[in-house]
């Protein structure tokens, strides 16, 4: 999708009901409940015979508009907006998994996703099968009749590995298993996940979509392409909806877990959508230019960015995400002490977590996100104490490079 297509689709989505004052900005409905003209209309709404809003934990006009805008630019069947990226992951897998089922995934996962899988889902009787997602034969051998999903982070954080989505999709679909992907690192304005075989897309909208680090949010995007008749848990809903997954999620799981996005966040992130493409274009190009400069900077041991020609994942990253695959890179210094010394000398780049804010952010993953993990767990997850993760913002390449350079002296 090019910029013109993205913006035209996004800005072409009208609010479902005309505002009484003709506001060009999105109305923010902070109302918890909604009045009906009759008992009959209320019954129809609560029983799902109409699409009227009843209670903002279930649906809300402002949040629904945000969901519709995401649908318009992704060609999705259904979109559910939640209050964080982890809410998206947990809601999705509580919809998919059952006691006795298993999930096939990479060992190299974002810290909270790993914790949710290993500590939370396993307590409900769900098995997590870790494997190398870049080894298709190994992936295939892990999938069986009780596999509820093959899960992949399109670029792992902070390990920066890239799996072949088309190959994973082919193996998963041959065995009647959905491919579920966390695509947070590369936004949907830059690539089409459904074209690469992704069935369910999970996104932390806190990141690129929020833009300015103003709000927490998460998205579950169902492309409506998977045949759920082979799902042990969801096949009973196939006669009720084109997507049994979306039906189960909206009618039960998200209502019961109570993690729906708030109207204020939907308003802010809907505005963020309007500048997503132009912000990402600048940030990702800056990230590539900076990565090239860091390769030749004294004191930097190694640089990991998929867009570098000597990166082992360069070709697959280029084919899936283009020349600038995301606005995050990692680089290694000689020791943890050198990392801390460097962090403490930075003047422009902010020492903070989060990704894809308008300002550049840096963090030492091993001591923060993975700080409570054992050394053995960090080694298994591929997290090194010499690694720094940099999220590139809207600053100039020169300003970022000069800040890094002076901090290394």
Report each predicted region and the residues it spans.
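Short loop segments at secondary-structure junctions
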Residues: 33, 223-226, 333-337
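PLP-dependent enzyme catalytic core of the Aspartate aminotransferase-like
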Residues: 118-119, 127-128, 141, 145, ...
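N-terminal glycine-rich, Lys/His-bearing helix-loop that initiates the first secondary-structure elements
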Residues: 1-52
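Short Gly/aromatic-enriched secondary-structure transition segments
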Residues: 43-49, 346, 404-407
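Conserved PLP-enzyme active-site core in the AAT-like
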Residues: 7-16, 78-298
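Short hydrophobic/aromatic beta-strand micro-patches
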Residues: 221, 330-332, 391-393
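Conserved N-terminal alpha-helix of the aminotransferase class I/II PLP-enzyme fold
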Residues: 33, 38-90, 112-120
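Conserved small-domain helix->loop->beta segment predominantly found in fold-type I
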Residues: 259, 271, 280-282, 287-358, ...
């Amino acid at each position: 999708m090019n910029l013109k297509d993205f913006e035209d689709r996004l800005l072409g989505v009208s609010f479902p009901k005309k505002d009484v004052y003709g506001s060009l900005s999105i109305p923010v409905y902070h109302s918890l409940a909604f009045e009906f003209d009759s008992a009959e209309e209320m019954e129809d709404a609560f029983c799902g015979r109409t699409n009227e809003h009843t209670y903002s934990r279930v649906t809300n006009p402002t949040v629904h508009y945000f969901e519709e805008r995401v649908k318009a630019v992704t060609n999705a069947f259904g979109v559910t907006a939640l209050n964080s990226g982890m809410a998206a992951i947990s809601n999705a897998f509580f919809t998919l998994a059952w006691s006795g089922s298993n999930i096939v995934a990479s060992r190299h996962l974002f810290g909270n996703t790993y914790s949710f899988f290993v500590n939370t889902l396993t307590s409900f009787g769900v098995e997590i099968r870790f494997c190398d997602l870049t080894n298709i034969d190994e992936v295939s051998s892990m999938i069986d009749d009780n596999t509820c999903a093959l899960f992949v982070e399109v670029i792992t954080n902070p390990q920066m590995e890239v799996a072949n989505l088309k190959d994973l999709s082919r193996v998963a679909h041959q065995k009647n298993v959905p491919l579920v992907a966390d695509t947070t690192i590369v936004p949907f304005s830059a690539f089409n996940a459904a074209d690469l075989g992704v069935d369910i897309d999970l996104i932390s909208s806190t990141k690129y979509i929020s833009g300015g680090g103003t709000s927490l949010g998460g998205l579950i995007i169902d492309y409506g392409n998977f045949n759920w008749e082979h799902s042990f848990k969801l096949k009973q809903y196939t006669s009720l909806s084109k997507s049994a997954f979306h039906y189960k999620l909206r009618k039960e799981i998200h209502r019961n877990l109570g993690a729906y996005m708030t109207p204020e966040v939907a308003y802010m992130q809907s505005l963020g959508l309007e500048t997503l493409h132009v912000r990402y274009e600048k940030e990702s190009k800056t990230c590539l230019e900076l990565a090239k400069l860091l390769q030749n900077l004294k004191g930097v041991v190694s640089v990991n960015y998929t867009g570098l020609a000597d990166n082992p994942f360069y070709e697959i990253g280029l084919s899936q995400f283009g020349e600038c695959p995301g606005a995050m890179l990692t680089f290694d210094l000689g020791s943890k002490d050198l990392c801390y010394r460097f962090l403490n000398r930075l003047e422009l780049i902010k020492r903070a977590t989060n990704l894809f804010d308008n300002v550049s952010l840096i963090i030492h993953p091993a001591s923060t996100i993975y700080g409570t993990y054992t050394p053995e767990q960090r080694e298994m997850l591929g997290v090194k104490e010499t690694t720094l993760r940099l999220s590139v913002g809207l600053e100039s390449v020169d300003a970022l490079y000069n800040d890094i350079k002076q901090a290394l002296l």
